Design a protein with these regions (language model features):
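Short, solvent-exposed loop/turn segments at secondary-structure boundaries
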Residues: 38-41, 99, 160-164, 223-226
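FAD-binding beta-loop-beta segment adjacent to the flavin cofactor pocket
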Residues: 16, 132-135, 190-212, 262, ...
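Conserved mid-domain beta->alpha element of the FAD-binding
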Residues: 197-269
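C-terminal helical "tail/cap" subdomain of flavin- and related membrane-associated enzymes
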Residues: 239-341
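A short, flexible beta-alpha/helix-coil linker loop
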Residues: 32-34, 155-157, 217-220
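N-terminal FAD cofactor-binding segment of flavoenzymes
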Residues: 1-32, 47, 107, 111
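Predominantly flavin-linked oxidoreductase catalytic cores and closely associated redox partners
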Residues: 55-185, 193-202, 211
Length: 341
């Protein structure tokens, strides 16, 4: 997570749980490499689990599948039921025909290497790798002198994840870089939505009266698919709710989600350009052009705070994709329905 993604108090709230914070990061493309001075933090699932377990103590229920979640309680697969005035559904993305999506798919291996890797900063986007049938890059996170997370990320039209194929690719890249893997410490994988358009009101209506957060509630960055920064905002919204009841919190979250959707329209245009305006092997050129822009603009992009001037700066100049194809991508989808609740 980049430091400017969250407000100052939001960053301060989660900073104790970061495994590491770096003073900057790098990117690599066929035409150049660049180092940026934006602070970057690594928050692991283990750290989040530890914080949650410490806060909930004996009230934490683990290893149980939730079959039903309603505004007044939840029912588990083992037959247990819980009643509560406030139920929050954070079970991740759910399939919905209301939204049209591309997908950010990734598999990462945290490895202990036989020798130090030599990286001092994260490389959040290494697009010098083979592109093939989609926009693809590697994400490299140096967690220690000989500990390295190597993640293969692909922006794909289909959500299916070829776990074995991704893993083989990661090991091949490690070999090319001269990194001999002594041990795989853990694996992570995911498929995140990259929204191209749709009827957000219909998406919200599918949730019923249960407050939904994270990807399930539509709270994620429209281009990266990441949800941590918006999770901080929604947590603050819930914590300050005048009445902690499911229906009241659901209304407040819907209002926030609709406001976010309306503010994210420009990102959905860019997403359509990425997925529809260039041949798959050429899509990296869009990001290659983007990362030449000033660092403050890049920070505002990931923080969801683009100004009108920023949007103009992103679009002006010689486009990295054919002009007619870009126009078709912008205009080629059906008119987006207005969000409603």
């Amino acid at each position: 997570m980049f430091r400017p993604d969250a407000a100052k108090d939001g960053w301060s709230a989660i900073e104790p749980y970061f495994e590491r914070i770096w003073s900057g990061y790098t990117v690599a493309f066929p035409e150049y490499r660049r180092r940026l001075g934006t602070e970057y933090g690594c928050l692991t699932g283990a750290a989040l689990y530890g914080a949650t377990a410490a806060a909930l103590g004996a009230n934490l229920v683990e290893g149980a599948e939730v079959l039903e979640a309603g505004p007044d309680g939840a029912r588990l697969a083992d037959g247990r039921s819980f009643l509560a005035p406030l139920v929050i559904d954070g079970r991740g993305w759910r399939h919905s025909t209301a939204l049209r999506c591309g997908w950010q798919k990734f598999v990462g291996l945290e490895c202990r290497l036989e020798q130090p890797h030599g990286l001092d900063l994260p490389m959040v986007m290494d697009a010098e790798v083979e592109q093939a049938d989609c926009f693809r890059f590697l994400y490299l996170l140096p967690l220690g002198p000989d500990r390295l997370l190597i993640e293969d990320t692909r922006y794909s039209a289909e959500p299916e994840l070829d776990l074995r194929g991704f893993t083989v690719s990661i090991r091949r890249h490690a070999g090319v870089r001269g990194w001999r893997i002594a041990e795989v410490l853990r694996r992570e994988e995911g498929v995140l939505p990259v929204v191209l358009g749709g009827d957000f009101g219909a998406f919200l209506a599918e949730q019923g009266s249960v407050p939904a957060v994270g990807a399930r509630g539509g709270f994620f960055h429209p281009t990266s698919g990441y949800s941590l920064a918006r999770a901080i905002d929604t947590a603050a919204l819930i914590a300050t709710a005048p009445r902690p009841a499911s229906r009241d919190v659901a209304t407040a979250l819907r209002q926030r989600a609709i406001a976010d959707w309306r503010g994210d329209g420009f990102y959905r245009v860019l997403n359509r350009m990425l997925f529809q305006a260039a041949a798959p092997a050429e899509r990296y050129r869009i990001l290659q052009r983007f990362y030449r822009l000033p660092q403050p603009l890049i920070e505002r992009f990931y923080g969801g705070r683009l100004t009108l001037a920023d949007k103009a700066r992103i679009l002006l100049g010689r486009p990295p994709v054919p002009i007619l194809a870009a126009l078709r991508a912008v205009r080629g989808l059906p008119q987006e329905a207005s969000a409603h609740a």
